[in-house]
């Protein structure tokens, strides 16, 4: 089984280079000032210049306005990951304004009822990202996981990715339970919030390659 990978929240040339070297399919940049992983569009542009074309560049946003999306897109992004309370109407507006950009919608999952929102984004988002629900200001990147068994028999309305509490030690179990074909990691390759560890990035990507 071929599982694709996204390393999210990168902010240095060294960690970007490591993610590329070990085969990440997507690299994510956070454009949310309250996050310890936040970068400016200017910083993202500098980092994106070292990423080859075959690696997709995702921007992570929380209820962004179009001005921020435009500035971030100019850095070289290929996709928007929306991690806030964006409604279906708002996503439709973003798609109309940025028709060539891939759109992912993150869903916060704590129980089976939370999956009921997934079909609302059919025809609007290109992909759903299932992440663990958090209680604080930050909508993701907290190292929390939800009960993966919720996805075991679920009929997904869209292509999807798994996130939340993943690391090199549990990724095999996570994929075995959920059947995920795309996995997204942030805090699981950090030594502290916002500080990525190159060894952990390499170990995670190598672990996925062995699946």
UniProtKB/Swiss-Prot annotation:
Disulfide bonds: none annotated. Pfam families: PRAI (PF00697). Signal peptide: none annotated. Gene3D superfamilies: Aldolase class I. GO terms for molecular function: phosphoribosylanthranilate isomerase activity. It catalyses: N-(5-phospho-beta-D-ribosyl)anthranilate = 1-(2-carboxyphenylamino)-1-deoxy-D-ribulose 5-phosphate. Its EC number is 5.3.1.24. Pathway: Amino-acid biosynthesis; L-tryptophan biosynthesis; L-tryptophan from chorismate: step 3/5. InterPro entries: Aldolase_TIM, PRAI_dom, RibuloseP-bd_barrel, TrpF_fam. It is an enzyme of class 5 (isomerase). GO terms for biological process: L-tryptophan biosynthetic process. Keywords: Amino-acid biosynthesis, Aromatic amino acid biosynthesis, Isomerase, Tryptophan biosynthesis. Belongs to the TrpF family. HAMAP family: PRAI. This is N-(5'-phosphoribosyl)anthranilate isomerase. It comes from Zymomonas mobilis subsp. mobilis (strain ATCC 31821 / ZM4 / CP4).
């Amino acid at each position: 089984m071929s599982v694709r990978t996204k390393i999210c929240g990168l902010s240095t040339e060294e960690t970007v280079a490591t993610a590329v070297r070990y085969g990440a399919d997507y690299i994510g940049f956070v454009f949310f000032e309250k996050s310890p992983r936040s970068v400016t569009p200017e910083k993202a542009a500098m980092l994106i210049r070292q990423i080859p074309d075959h690696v997709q560049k995702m921007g992570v946003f929380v209820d962004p306005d179009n001005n921020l999306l435009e500035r971030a897109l100019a850095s070289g992004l290929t996709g928007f990951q929306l991690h806030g309370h964006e409604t279906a109407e708002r996503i439709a507006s973003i798609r109309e304004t940025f028709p060539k950009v891939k759109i992912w919608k993150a869903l916060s999952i704590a129980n089976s009822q939370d999956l009921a929102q997934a079909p609302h984004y059919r025809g609007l988002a290109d992909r759903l990202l299932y992440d663990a629900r958090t209680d604080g200001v930050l909508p993701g990147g907290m190292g929390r996981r939800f009960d993966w068994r919720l996805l075991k028999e679920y009929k997904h309305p869209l292509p999807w990715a798994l996130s939340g509490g993943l690391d090199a030690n549990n990724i095999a179990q996570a994929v075995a339970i959920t059947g995920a074909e795309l996995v997204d990691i942030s805090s699981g390759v950090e030594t502290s919030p916002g500080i990525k560890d190159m060894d952990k990035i390499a170990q995670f990507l190598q672990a996925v390659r062995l699946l």
